[in-house]
Amino acid sequence: MSITKDQIIEAVSAMSVMDVVELISAMEEKFGVSAAAAVAVAAGPAEAAEEKTEFDVILKAAGANKVAVIKAVRGATGLGLKEAKDLVESAPAALKEGVSKDDAEALKKSLEEAGAEVEVK
């Protein structure tokens, strides 16, 4: 007859703290693992799962309709005609940095409708 999981849990819950520590050490030696490493690995992915809140909008290329893209850049950034033209011609260039996801997506959509190639990072 084999021991069930419930029987093991009952036996461990009846042990003193020192006995549990010794049991853990014995299990680490027997199976060649470390309980501390398992805890650290389990905590790692949770930090990586944090959602990004600030995005950068990068103009990668102006496309065929450069005039429409310049107008869209002027409207989105408030730059003058010359500054917007210089920015579009120097692509790839950052249009806006540290904006919300909704603002970044809206800007990307308006620029792509004008014919530009845009990336949100």
Swiss-Prot record:
A Gene Ontology molecular function term of the record: mRNA binding
Gene3D superfamilies hit by this protein: 3.30.1390.10, Single helix bin
Gene Ontology biological-process entries: translation
GO cellular component term, pick one: cytosolic large ribosomal subunit
Top-level taxon in the UniProt lineage: Bacteria
Post-translational note: Acetylation of Ser-2 converts L12 to L7.
A family per Pfam: Ribosomal_L12
Residue numbers bearing the N-acetylserine modification: S2
Sorted UniProt keywords: Acetylation, Ribonucleoprotein, Ribosomal protein
Subunit structure comment from the entry: Homodimer. Part of the ribosomal stalk of the 50S ribosomal subunit. Forms a multimeric L10(L12)X complex, where L10 forms an elongated spine to which 2 to 4 L12 dimers bind in a sequential fashion. Binds GTP-bound translation factors.
Protein role: Forms part of the ribosomal stalk which helps the ribosome interact with GTP-bound translation factors. Is thus essential for accurate translation.
Family named by the database record: Belongs to the bacterial ribosomal protein bL12 family.
Database matches in PANTHER family: 39S RIBOSOMAL PROTEIN L12 (PTHR45987), LARGE RIBOSOMAL SUBUNIT PROTEIN BL12M (PTHR45987:SF4)
Name the UniProt record assigns to this protein: Large ribosomal subunit protein bL12
Annotated source species: Salmonella typhimurium (strain LT2 / SGSC1412 / ATCC 700720)
Name of the gene encoding the protein in the UniProt record: rplL
